[in-house]
């Protein structure tokens, strides 16, 4: 439990109802949603606006108390949960969504606004959010900015960094930085917005975000293609990227993952037999364009002899069913146990080799494990999920990440570094790059108040 002095200071800022010190109430903030990462919080503070965030950080900074910013707690690398006695700064009450600028396609939202809610507001105004993911009903915009989240539409719109026009954030000492509203073009000095995007709450606490929206494309066509393996999926995916202007998503999964989804959710299989690999393709267009989308997709797939079977869906219910085979992977994996979740990117020409090599390597280091891979094929991004090894067996993670580094890949495509991949980052990044990162951390948070031990190793400058 926090000291009386700090508790009193925090209560004076946000009120007693929003300083949580009861262990049972804190529990939901102390464990990530996979159940793999957990710790104990000094207390949980729930500010409702930027002035309260400023007050909380000033109070914590005054006594050198470490702070862990937390959004929807849907992260997968342990970056948003306490490690041992930090103050958890929950941003869920900063959920305001301003009216959409319907003429220019922009909106300002609070860091605690949930993606699904922002998307609904945007669509009502004829616009959409360029990033989407299965956790849309719990993931917050602030958390997505802090991890530079990706998702299923990166192939079309890019990651979260591409959607952010400006942001407002608070440094560890309570200083407010950033610009709201942001501008489409602004080359005045260093790109602070770009720096804070993807910084995992280690440099500042994001409080508001100015998003650039994309046109809402209501007509969708989804195809699920059965293939002989990842090599064929890459061939087909490359052809579709060249020929389909309407391409909206390009996702890959495998027979073992589909079997697990069916086993855990009861979802029937899409074809009358199993195939080694599956490519889910979505095309999108403006109203009354479904027929054109179907024709274009059918024509493009017709030029791909690698496709062994296809299911095509136009109506919403059928589209959702095909998407369920991909999106329910995470649900099925979590239902089967506490997974090791690794999120990596490989050069396209190394993906096939990696997919084979990672399974072989895991057979060596964790012979009784169950390996499920799926991912965003258009970005070279695979999610490697390992079931079976104990949650604290980081040798399993290490084996995969060493393989990724050896093949010229990235150990984090969209989930961030957190605590889970910190050692791998220190091992695989250039020493000069790490030195530059540490210099930035020292400049913006010299006392290591914000998320110590996340992304970079802590020097132990703060109290917990």
Language-model-detected regions and their locations in the chain:
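Short, ordered loop/turn segments at secondary-structure junctions
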Residues: 24, 71-74, 94, 134, ...
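N-terminal accessory segments
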Residues: 1-33, 63-65, 300-318, 406-411, ...
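C-terminal substrate-recognition/cap domain of FAD-linked oxidoreductases
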Residues: 22-29, 211-215, 221-399, 403, ...
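Active-site cofactor/substrate anionic-group-binding motifs, chiefly glycine-
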Residues: 64-69, 74-79
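N-terminal flexible segment immediately upstream of the FAD-binding catalytic core
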Residues: 1-58, 75-105, 257-268, 315-343, ...
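FAD-binding subdomain of flavoenzyme oxidoreductases
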Residues: 96-251, 450
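Activity-critical C-terminal alpha-helical subdomain
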Residues: 175, 422-464
